[in-house]
Amino acid sequence: MLAKDDLGEVDPSLPDQVAAYRGGYLPEERRALERSLRSGDLRAVATTNALELGIDISGLDAVLVAGWPGTRASLWQQWGRAGRTHGEALGVFIAREDPLDRYVLEHPEVLFGQPVESVVIDPANPHLLGPHLAAAAAEQPLTEDDATQWFGLTAVDLLPDLVERGFLRRRPTGWYWTRRDRATDLIDLRGGAGSPVQLVEADTGRLLGTVDAARAHSAAHDGAIYVHQGSTFRVRALDLDASVALLEPVITDYSTTATDIADYTILHTDEELPWGRGSLSRGEVEVTSRVVGYLKRRYATGEILGEEPLDLPERKLRTRAVWWTVSDEQLCDAMVTEPWDIAGAAHAAEHASIGLLPLMASCDRWDIGGVSTPLHPDTGRCTVMVYDGHAGGAGFADRAFVIAEQWLTATRDAI
């Protein structure tokens, strides 16, 4: 929106030659933008990582990546969008005020001197495995031998649950898909949990796009500002039961950023190691979070114009986590003794560690979350936790535990 205004001051024809692109747009909108980009009618596009994979776009001369995209693989894939026709192209990485971005600038060897990240996944996670078993049964009857051979020993234990929930039916020849809808629709490649929330213009009924259910509380709450192809809308109402947000067009000079609070309970500690005078652990946790308000920020300057409260329900996530504790002696040695100083230092360590983990594990910054507290009741110490943002865990926290020395050393260097 601001880019189009600036371009219009240079040449009135330029605003129509740039556009925005993201995965939440309607399919017909995305296809039209892709055609315009291929034909040259569009000279530039501001996009999320939705253009990173699966779309053959040629003729691009340059790619500017604003902010670390999450992994080395993503950065090279995005840069690789340019130069497919003429053989030469320009790839630029523009760092943000972020610990990971600064770390990459100061340690370019992590980009140019190493292979892409190791793929991390927990294939036994029932939240991931269940939909895949259903999709396999929809292709042909799934036998116990097939389930064990292709999906692992834990797969057979999930089949009765899928039967009980009405997805599969047991027959002498195996398990069958029973529903009329497609089994593959159970698999959300965008990582959301639950049905996507539809963004609808209230006065016309026009569908503007969708947002993942997991992001709806922070991106489609009442009062949220939503920008669609240069037009600005404000969320009039969010109906979580119907998975619909009603929007109205507005003219405004501010954006919105949700604020939330979070806490966690350690359900089970699988492994604990001494970590200096503290400890390093991994296990199962339950994270409770709630969006409590949002900030209004002026577009041009980032100035905070105000804060509005929200009344949204709590969300609970049972997942895998890695956490470490800091002893009182360590805090005293570092001359961090006041409660607010301890909380601030722990929060800084939490954000830095979240930012650095994608360099070591094939995850996006938004695949993981973090919580820190000066004194947690389950540990009795200052505790910093990083958890998988997917129900049941995706393997990122367990990977972090294994490479903790490399990961937390990089975090310390970034701080």
Language-model-detected regions and their locations in the chain:
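Extended Lys/Arg-rich polyanion-binding regions
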Residues: E88-G91, E97-P115, D122, H127, ...
